[in-house]
A protein has these predicted regions:
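Acidic, small-polar-rich N-terminal luminal/periplasmic segments of exported/outer-membrane proteins
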Residues: 1-125
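Structural signature of outer-membrane beta-barrel domains
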Residues: 2-4, 59, 135-137, 165-169, ...
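Glycine-rich, histidine-containing beta strand-loop boundary motifs that form or position
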Residues: 43-45, 162, 204-206
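Outer-membrane beta-barrel translocator/receptor signature
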Residues: 50, 67-69, 81, 90-99, ...
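Short secondary-structure transition/capping segments
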Residues: 53-57, 171-172, 215-216
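Residue-level signature of outer-membrane beta-barrel architecture
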Residues: 74-76, 148-150, 192-195
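Outer-membrane beta-barrel domain signature, strongest for Gram-negative TonB-dependent receptors
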Residues: 177, 182-250
């Protein structure tokens, strides 16, 4: 693999640079869907879980035993399941959306395409950035990245990034008389980049994500003539993947 001009790549690719991402990447990967054509990211019940569709191709079931049709890569590392697909990456250098099968370059589970998140590398110079967000529904987000000066004769650079997402529950449960869907995510990453020679580069990154968010709220409703309602369009829970609602004659 090597970097190429996107105009020379014989494939359908959308690429977003850091400037674009800072304006659109508010909380997680769902924000990318609005700036890339043919891409739909549908959040599912589990925290950080999503069913991703490119050109209408997706895997409806997001159980860990199933492989997604659209793959998620972060820094070249494949994320094997739909769980935690909604990355909360803050210091992304760019995000690439490749449409169509990508088995030649990326291997299996890329029938529909893939989303590749490439984070920025340690710069070796002291500096950083911070982003503070306050919004309705008690949303309070803090994101920060710090680069440290290089050591070992300038060959070893390090970087630390941290994210704290809190609040943002906009569902009201009338029965419980409380807000539902509150977000509570704490994550950080430590990255070290070692360049012992001009021809050798070694990067090691440690990530830790603690997601204590509420389970995503869903609506239960019925059609005329139905006794029970199921989660919105997730009838597969009762073995009925083609129809919404649990039909019963009474």
């Amino acid at each position: 693999k090597r970097e190429e001009n996107i105009q020379d790549v014989p494939s359908s690719v959308s690429a977003m640079d850091a400037n674009t991402l800072e304006k659109t990447f508010a909380r997680d990967l769902m924000d990318v869907a609005g700036v890339s054509p043919n891409l739909i990211i549908d959040p599912i019940l589990g925290n950080g879980t999503a069913a991703i569709s490119i050109r209408g191709i997706q895997m409806n079931d997001v159980e860990k035993s199933f492989d997604p049709a659209v793959a998620i890569y972060q820094d070249g590392i494949y994320l094997a399941t739909a769980t935690a697909a909604l990355l909360n990456t803050w210091d992304a250098e760019r995000i690439e959306v490749l449409r169509g099968p990508q088995g030649t370059m990326f291997g299996r589970n890329t029938v529909g395409g893939l989303i590749h998140v490439i984070r920025s590398k340690p710069t070796g110079e002291l500096g950083g950035k911070i982003n503070l967000t306050a919004a309705e529904d008690e949303q309070k987000d803090v994101k920060a990245t710090i680069n440290f000066p290089a050591i070992l004769n300038g060959t070893l650079a390090t970087k630390v990034s941290a994210i704290k997402l809190d609040g943002g529950a906009y569902f009201y449960n009338k029965t419980r008389e409380s807000d539902e869907g509150d977000v509570d995510v704490t994550s950080y990453s430590i990255s070290a980049l070692w360049n012992p020679t001009d021809d050798l580069e070694i990067q090691i990154t440690y990530d830790d994500i603690d997601d204590q968010s509420d389970v995503r709220p869903v609506s239960c409703f019925t059609q005329p003539g139905e006794l029970f309602g199921l989660f919105q369009n997730i009838a597969a829970e009762c073995g009925n993947a083609s129809n919404l609602g649990f039909h019963r004659t009474v």
